Amino acid sequence: INSSFGNNANNRAEESIGSAFDAHTAFDEHLLGSSSIPPVMGYVMIVHDCPDSRIVGRGVRSAHFPIDPAFDGASDLDRFLLLCDRLRRKSLYQAVWLVFANPEDGVAYEPSALLSYDKFIANIVMALGVHRA
């Protein structure tokens, strides 16, 4: 994600949650074949780490529902971290990898050990092992 961070955060949240829900529902309704083991799903997000994505407290508002306090005063990078952590904790995806990268200086980093490449690969391999057993 490289621009329009606020809009992109909302769109990526809707897409990632919706896609996971659709896949889980398709499995529950036996639309993915006869397997009794749910599909293995991973989610990868790479976000541009730049001054715009680090702005804290960008106005988050809702006309209909209260805003989760975790988002109060959060930068867009913080919001992406919250999204990816919740996708993992809620088991919407078996593996989630989050990277913040700045192509101008070549620096990339993983903001959470639980959302690292190593954990992503380990979780995918483990989940696929269940399918192969």
Specify the residue positions occupied by each region the protein language model found:
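Charge-rich, low-complexity intrinsically disordered segments
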Residues: 99-133
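Acidic, metal/cofactor-coordinating or nucleic-acid-engaging core segments within structured domains
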Residues: 4-101
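A glycine-rich, hydrophobic loop/mini-helix early in the fold
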Residues: 1
